[in-house]
């Protein structure tokens, strides 16, 4: 009822002939979580909607393979275009920053300007690869975050501006075009593998 009331409220003050309704959920790489929500909401009488919006942060919401498979299955299941309406990655590690080494390992890229750009290129590429041009784009949250003296949290290392207010190379990920998309340029994503290690012996990595 609350979601439907929000849709009706927006429709009452907007041009209903142009307004589109998006359902925005987190957990962009968790298909079964999202399916459970949509199926439950539709059974409960969710009004029609036009777009699916997802949040995807690679250190929280699953692997890049999870994201790709989730988006493909949602398109097949609900026949709605999809956008990534929240995504971000760190451009550095710092004491007060948001990304630590554990999250950096989960995301699979270093917390650096180059790593930030690569994550964004990968998320853009996955979105563009959806069948029938159903991937509509990617929004960054929050590009204008800038480190300030004694600031911590998201501002410290998750924006697209460095400590001097200069735009970093991650912005170039948004010059992406569907026509210029090259699947061969993707990073290879490896699934988890079992590994046995012994103290004092170098591990043989797969």
Language model: regions and residue ranges:
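Short, internal active-site loops enriched in acidic
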Residues: 26-31, 143-147
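Extended hydrophobic secondary-structure segments that form protein cores and membrane-embedded regions
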Residues: 21-25, 139-142
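Aromatic-rich peripheral "rim/lid" segments of glycoside hydrolase catalytic domains that contact
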Residues: 69, 73-76, 92-122, 126-206
């Amino acid at each position: 009822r609350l979601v439907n009331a929000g849709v009706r409220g927006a429709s009452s003050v907007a041009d209903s002939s142009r307004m589109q309704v998006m359902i925005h959920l987190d957990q962009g790489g968790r298909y079964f979580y999202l399916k459970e929500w949509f199926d439950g909401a539709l059974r409960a009488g969710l009004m029609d909607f036009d777009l699916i919006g997802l949040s995807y942060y690679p250190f929280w919401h699953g692997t890049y393979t999870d994201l790709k498979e989730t988006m493909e299955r949602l398109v097949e299941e609900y026949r709605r275009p999809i956008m990534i309406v929240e995504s971000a990655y760190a451009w550095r590690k710092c004491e007060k920053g948001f990304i630590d080494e554990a999250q950096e390992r989960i995301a699979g890229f270093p917390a650096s300007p180059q790593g930030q750009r690569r994550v964004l290129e990968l998320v853009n590429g996955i979105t563009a690869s959806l069948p029938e041009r159903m991937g509509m784009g990617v929004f960054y949250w929050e590009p204008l975050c800038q480190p300030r003296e004694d600031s911590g949290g998201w501002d410290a290392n998750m924006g697209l501006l460095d400590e001097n207010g200069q735009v970093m190379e991650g912005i170039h990920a948004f010059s992406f075009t569907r026509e210029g998309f090259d699947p061969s340029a993707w990073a290879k994503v490896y699934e988890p593998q079992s590994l046995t290690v012994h103290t004092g012996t170098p591990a043989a990595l797969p």
